[in-house]
Amino acid sequence: MRFSKLSLAITTTLVTANALAQSVELDSINVIATRDPSRFAYTPEKQSKDSLLSKQATSVADALEDIPNVDVRGGSRSIAQKPNIRGLSDNRVVQVIDGVRQNFDLAHRGSYFLPMSLIQEIEVIKGPSSSLWGSGALGGVVAMRTPNALDLLKNNDKFGVKIRQGYQTANNLSEKDVSVFAANDKFDVLISGFYNNADNLRTGKGNKLNNTAYKQFGGLAKFGWQINDANRVELSHRETRFKQTAPSNNEVENELTNEQITDQIKKFHGQKDDLLPPTTQPSPSERSEFYSKVKTRLGSVSYLTDQQIPDQSTVFNYYLTPDNPYLNTHIALYNNKTIEKEQRKVSGVKDQTKLTTRGINLRNSSELSHISFVYGVDYMRDKIRTERGTNGSDAKFRADPYNANSNTTGVYLIAHIPLFGEKLLVSPSVRYDHYDTSSKTVKYKDNHLSPATKLTWIVTNWLDFTAKYNEAFRAPSMQERFVSGAHFGANTLGLDHINRFVANPNLRPETAKNKEITANLHFDSLFKQGDKFKIEATYFRNDVKDFINLKIFNDAKTSASAGANPNTNGALLPKNSQYQNITNARLSGIELQAQYQTERLTLFTNYGSTKGKDKDSGEALSNIAASKIGVGVNYALVKDKFTVGATVTHYAAQRRVPKDHSVTYPSYILTDLRATYAPLKGEWKNLRLDFALENLFDRKYQPAFSLMEGTGRNAKISAVYSF
């Protein structure tokens, strides 16, 4: 079979020496997250298909939790889980699938809709990365790649079928997927389909999380045409649909209605009847403490809803890879569409958020003597359309619907300059972005320059140092720009008390400046012939300016009148909500990874810790994951056939919380076991069996800043048969 150099490079990088290695692969070459096909490219942290099959994770965030300072945010519902990288998550981490950005982001809902069965590998860049991907990459980048026929065909076969069935006991999750694929000298094609069905999730000690059942189904089609050795085109289409009944805030355990909030407010103010005024007037500090407790223990107002999320993406790729050092070109055209639909169970009120993204990416790399360049242009247009239902009861106080558009154009340049016989490598990069957002009545536009540089010093053949400086930014989202109407409200004394969104025309982009240094030691044949030992240590400090937060407050006039007269409208509830630049933050931490590997044995450990504080007040930041340390072992009982492993992870107590956060989080230890039967030859070479037992001792625990408990003991089994 004949494929271009790029196709072969992509395919061969997927091969791993150890099917169950949980540690980071530091030596493979990747061109997805870094956008850099040169031999000097920075190597991101990666989860291969083998490690994904072994772990049997149910979300991208779950699959990455073994990586230091990468944690799960969003609770225990898999659809709501998002990676938290060095204390930053949500729209501060860029999500990429097959080289294309995924921009859907709706507060307290999911945004990672790609099922694990359609993921071939995941790459993670930790730290600001706007010089590569533009707005949003303050915390880093999570890049996923779906499979093609070349990944799945074996031994020069021209046709194949892969069938997989998975099952997990914690929620009776059944995972079914089938792939059919074929290739010849010119063409390759893949068609995959999947269906996942889960019941309510079991947490530690046998408790059940209500309204965590779900269904997800969909498929992927890919077609490739190898025109000649230098030209290749690919067309892919992916479509998934997710269904569940859950609180509209997917991160909370149970629904929290306006009526429940109002009852708590009345009780706090000593109001026993709607027709009677409050009997107490709490101090500002008491009021602040009360409202923070409601938020941190229960979450925001959230009604039980039937939810559907259709998600689709179409991508056209063209690769030009002639035998020319100046040309290594990739062009991608794409169209993404995501719709989030909700209907309240009791009242039937409907909401809908629809985001369409169309764009083009152009990238080329050139080798000029001893200098490598990678450069490109990105353009994307986001269009959002929202619907927000109202009524006179449970949907009386709602945000207004809004429609808006956003256009972003970015140009970037990466250079690699080796010096002193490649003992020293200087890699500067820069990106310029121009963006505008507009509704029918308002338009905003701005631009931003994001520089970065990396210095690598190879001291000896077993020691090297890397120093980085990266800048990043996040432009205000369309929701932050254009949301209006009521945030929440209550009716007491026959009066409506309404908290309303207030537009902020002076909202500035968030910016980050990150400094980090890494030391990497690596030895071959250290204790015995053929063994390998690696240890890597990183320290980082990320200064983030102009954090955008939603602030709830009273204006001076309302506060004064409320203090003088408790019956004044606004005395019970703050009147205003506004997105503001209110925090200058510092995120700093360390990461340690070590691995020792022989032909059959792999020992590994990793440690990650992030501290976050407000630089102005010194107060701890919210949503910073607890420090964690993990140790593990993998051993091939039968070489090239049967491997077993175990990991023990200790999560430290998280007591560094903001002053108005009423909850701290105790420490806990989780123990996981795994085994894989995957013979490389013989009559069962087409069969792979994976078994995992997570949270072996059924610990009851709650991750830091989560509003619900984590998954209890969970036995997992997966069978894959290919022919």
UniProtKB/Swiss-Prot annotation:
Annotated TBDR beta-barrel domain residues: 158-723
Span of the signal peptide: 1-21
InterPro entries associated with the record: Plug_dom, Plug_dom_sf, TonB-dep_rcpt-like, TonB-dep_rcpt_b-brl, TonB_haem/Hb_rcpt, TonB_Hb/transfer/lactofer_rcpt, TonB_rcpt_b-brl_sf, TonB_rcpt_CS
Motif (TonB C-terminal box): 706-723
Disulphide linkage map: none
A Pfam short name: TonB_dep_Rec_b-barrel
One Gene Ontology biological process: siderophore transmembrane transport
GO MF term (any one): heme transmembrane transporter activity
Primary site of residence: membrane
Domain TBDR plug, first and last residues per copy: 36-147
GO cellular component labels: cell outer membrane
CDD domains, sorted: ligand_gated_channel
Swiss-Prot/TrEMBL keywords: Cell outer membrane, Membrane, Signal, TonB box, Transmembrane, Transmembrane beta strand, Transport
Record PANTHER family: HEME_HEMOPEXIN UTILIZATION PROTEIN C, TONB-DEPENDENT OUTER MEMBRANE RECEPTOR
Similarity section: Belongs to the TonB-dependent receptor family.
Protein name: Heme/hemopexin utilization protein C
